[in-house]
Amino acid sequence: MSPTGFFLLTVLLVLVTEAASRGPREKFSQSAEDPYSENMNLKILASGRGSSSTFGAFSRSENSRSNFKSKSPSSITREKVNEESRSEMSSTSSHFGLKMRRSHGGGEMNPFETKVKTRITRK
């Protein structure tokens, strides 16, 4: 058995034993805490036995992003955030895709805040 096959089999075994060890009450309480858990259906489609392409195909429910609504109140005001030029970023932060940003509030300059830029693509 190849090391990749052994690793995938071990991960599958851990996932199955964790799912079997949960009781029905714990599953219910988890779904009550996370309202989006029922919309996030992640399925593994096995395309070949023992091959590395076993975990290659995933499908996600179509309505998971379309049903998303922000729970934050509309009265919260957000400060404008200006993105600094790329030349002012350090080489280590640009290596990891980090952007340095500065917020202006009330005429005073706040310390720089590092935020990770993530992209969400829709299918």
UniProtKB/Swiss-Prot annotation:
Localization per Swiss-Prot or TrEMBL: Secreted, Extracellular space
Compositionally biased residues, Low complexity: 64-75
InterPro entries cross-referenced by the UniProt entry: Svs4/5/6
GO cellular component entries: extracellular space
Chief location category: secreted
Tissue: Testis.
Transmembrane segments: none
Signal peptide: 1-21
Keywords: Secreted, Signal
Induction: By testosterone.
Highest taxon, organism lineage: Eukaryota
Family per similarity comment: Belongs to the SVP2/SVP5/SVP6 family.
PANTHER family linked: SEMINAL VESICLE SECRETORY PROTEIN 5, SEMINAL VESICLE SECRETORY PROTEIN 6-RELATED
Name of the protein in its database record: Seminal vesicle secretory protein 5
Organism: Rattus norvegicus
Lineage start: Eukaryota, Metazoa, Chordata, Craniata, Vertebrata
